[in-house]
Amino acid sequence: MRITKFFKEFFSNSQSSGVLLVLCVTISLMIANSSAATGFQAILDKMIGPYSVSMWINDGLMAVFFLLVGLEIKRELLKGELSNFKNASLPIFAAIGGMIVPAIIFTIFNHGTEYSNGWAISMATDIAFSLAIVAMLGKSVPSAIKVFLAALAIVDDLGAIIVIAIFYTDEIHWNYLAFSGLVIVLLAALNYFKVKKHIFYLIPGVFLWYFMHHSGIHATIAGVILAFTIPANSENESEPSPLEKLEHFLHIPVSFAIMPIFALANTNITFKAGMVDGLFSSFGYGIVFGLILGKLIGINLFSFIAIKLKISSLPDRSRWIHMAGAGLLAGIGFTMSIFIALLSYKDSQELQDSAKFAILTASILAGSLGYLLLKNAAKNDNSI
């Protein structure tokens, strides 16, 4: 009985998922730098059908994660923190600043060098890890800041996907993109005609994922698109809507299975000689300062301008110290930054390894600083 109660409390506690994710990162790094590294990598490279285990995790399972985040954002846009224009516009301005300033900082350090192609590395935010840190803080962070960071990260990821498609993708398969468009039209029609059954959305959603993946565009975007077509109204107001039902159903598997698996598979970075030296070079400075200072300055500067121009407003019950904390957490680049680094330096394993270490270092620093800042803000709020 006590064990059942423990698991019930564990899975209902938002902080538990963040702690579990950090634990998985630690385990993954330990495995990557032990004798088990080769065997672990072999598991990730193992083919299941046409794709590797790693691909199924990064493009398949993470599409489900993006589906959940998309559902949460849609709910907030319709009924919650983002339901008015001033609140909804702020994450967009913040994300734009959070992409432009880091890219400028990296370019300042690396313009005209062999590293210059990696200008987009510092633009990315790893939404899974940034939201996990927020989850660890529990109720000490205003709910509006959590929603702001989630929306910002979604816009940031959309921006990164567009950048990858334009600057880093060798070829876009327009026929598959056209098929994706047809599926989106079908999903929109289902919503328009008030079809409520989840199955009628989920089956086309699988096809949307398949077509997106084969088009050359990152398939996780299919999860967000699908989420925005799920009906948010129920036939009976006393019952939860299809959106709310699906969101509730996905919460535990995403938080306690998909995200930990993602962490295990994507932070297995092997430390090599010379990696630390790479931090103290224009290349390392561009990545580290881009992710930490670039995100912090860009997000808060563009937010400040939008608020001063009365286009946007600060999230409910939040202060600029909360915005600074969110800006730092957005500097957790991790997997998205590593993905862009791999595309930027396809022909240089040495540069890929140096980029991975710089991204890992910057992400740990940004996450730690953001956590401490938001934790301190909560203490100050409680003392008032």
Q: Where is each model-derived feature located?
A:
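Predominantly late transmembrane helices and immediately cytosolic-facing juxtamembrane segments
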Residues: R2-N13, F193, K197-F207, F211, ...
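Alpha-helical transmembrane segments of multi-pass membrane proteins
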Residues: V25-G39, N266
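Membrane-interface helix termini and inter-helical loops of multi-pass transporters
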Residues: A36-P50, N110-Y115, I162, D170, ...
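Structural signature of hydrophobic alpha-helical transmembrane segments
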Residues: M55-F66, T113-A128, T169-V185, H218-I225, ...
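Entry/N-cap segments of selected transmembrane alpha helices
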Residues: L77-I104, H173-V185, F271-I297, W320-A324, ...
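Transmembrane alpha-helices that form the ion-translocation and gating core
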Residues: F93-L131, V288-S344, T361, L365-N376
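Hydrophobic alpha-helical transmembrane segments in multi-pass integral membrane proteins
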Residues: I104, V163-I164, H213, I217, ...
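Functional cores that coordinate and move charged inorganic groups
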Residues: V134, G138-S140, A144-P231
